[in-house]
């Protein structure tokens, strides 16, 4: 009996010493890369072609080949909102890429902002996150690390706006002429 009891403190000491209480290293750069409608097998299929920064992301980043988010309408706006905020898009009003706004009595783009002006070109539409009173990943990073810069770039307006969150430093998206533009919601 004495023999078996002597092992108990030794095992307890081993487990308590082997537990690592240190915090993980905080990364200097966080990139959320979303490729709309890209199948995950294409990442490995063309693996030998990747070089530079993309090669580094493939070798050292975290990527998900079978990620799912539960919402019924899988258009760009709702999907990118779910990724950028971790919330169900319909609950805050992102019910599609465009929808009928009862207050305005017209069909609107999900990131339409009638109070914003285009910055960066003469043509294009001003977009912003102003319709949504919620935060996202970029906002959480800035709230935890005040020196952080959040920049959201997308080919589509709703991609840049909805993945950037409420207060990114910049959101850039293409206009119909193929130029990157923004709105005065983000820059002056």
Where does each model-flagged region fall?
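Bacterial N-terminal signal peptides
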Residues: 8-16
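Bacterial Sec-dependent signal peptides at the C-terminal "C-region" and cleavage site
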Residues: 15-26
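Second-shell loop/turn segments in exported
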Residues: 39-45, 69, 123-128
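Beta-strand elements within well-structured catalytic alpha/beta cores of enzymes
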Residues: 27-39, 57, 83, 141
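Bacterial N-terminal signal peptides that target proteins for export
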Residues: 1-8
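Extracytoplasmic/secreted cell-surface and envelope-processing proteins
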Residues: 41-43, 76, 160-163
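His/Asp/Glu-rich, glycine-adjacent segments
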Residues: 96-188
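Short, structured active-site-proximal loop/turn typified by the sulfatase FGly-forming signature C/S-X-P-X-R
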Residues: 44-91, 149-153
